[in-house]
Amino acid sequence: MTDAPELKAFDQRLRDEAAEEPTLEVPQGEPKKKTQVIAIYGKGGIGKSFTLANLSYMMAQIGKRVLLIGCDPKSDTTSLLFGGKACPTIIETSARKKLAGEEVQIGDVCFKRDGVFAMELGGPEVGRGCGGRGIIHGFELLEKLGFHDWDFDYVLLDFLGDVVCGGFGLPIARDMAQKVILVGSNDLQSLYVTNNVCSAVEYFRKLGGNVGVAGLVINKDDGTGEAKAFAEAADIPILATIPADEDLRRKSANYQIVGIPGTQWGPLFEGLAHAVGEAPPIRPKPLSQDGLLDLFTPEAIGADFKLEPATDADMRGKNAAAKKSLEVIYDDA
């Protein structure tokens, strides 16, 4: 069975659009209200979605208007907020509506729970497009929906921090956010990502940008102290420390919100909500690779390992026969 001709034409149009340079512009006019747009970065699996779902819920409970936007192609930012139910993404909905000749409406892509508004930008299927370009396209669609006229106290953007693609760095590169929040833990890989984001912030500050780092949320804290040492070395504040606790792990796995006033974990997330709102954007001091490694004990990172250079013979293996020389050797006269 072959695709209908109109589907092939539609597929080609999408490919043509993906090949175009992004045209998203940062608005120059004065906003109607001072909304804090905050981008959250961290290593995949470090707990950004858990942190953001509970943070946004607590913000709403203390009277703030909050919009949570998932900017990760996995589209799992809002799952915890909505009890494990997946939202239709903006990218997916836009493609479907466009094929049907319809316009995307707010109710197609934005959903709410107890005062929190949330949506997912989404991204291409695996192997079928650029995730960063999908983020850019998603923000262009948000502008068409009236993003800059919306009335919120906070807009929280959940970004993947493991990649260096410009699309995922959009809030930093184009001053779309006022500040960045980092989520990390006491392990080298998560701090490597947070340090990379600090480097990106500092790079664009040197180019005249205004985005700064508000601070670090230490998640799954086991008390070993590496994340705290990183924050001190990078000169950024710690906004909250979330312990490695079995109750938190179990409730997160069951899609339960814990950032509720009057509960065991309520004070933790209420404190985080206030800290996020009040923390100023500052210029971080990114660490060098050696500086980052120095935060850990030699045993933890294999610092006593020595690099052994490979040789041409190593690479050739069984084919490492002696090369015939074309050099002409003359007998002694």
Curated annotation (Swiss-Prot):
Cofactors named for this entry: [4Fe-4S] cluster
Single annotated GO MF: metal ion binding
GO biological process, one term: photosynthesis
Binding site for [4Fe-4S] cluster: C130, C165
NCBIfam families, A to Z: BchX (TIGR02016)
Described purpose of this protein according to its UniProt entry: Converts chlorophylls (Chl) into bacteriochlorophylls (BChl) by reducing ring B of the tetrapyrrole.
Full protein name: Chlorophyllide reductase 35.5 kDa chain
Gene this protein is translated from: bchX
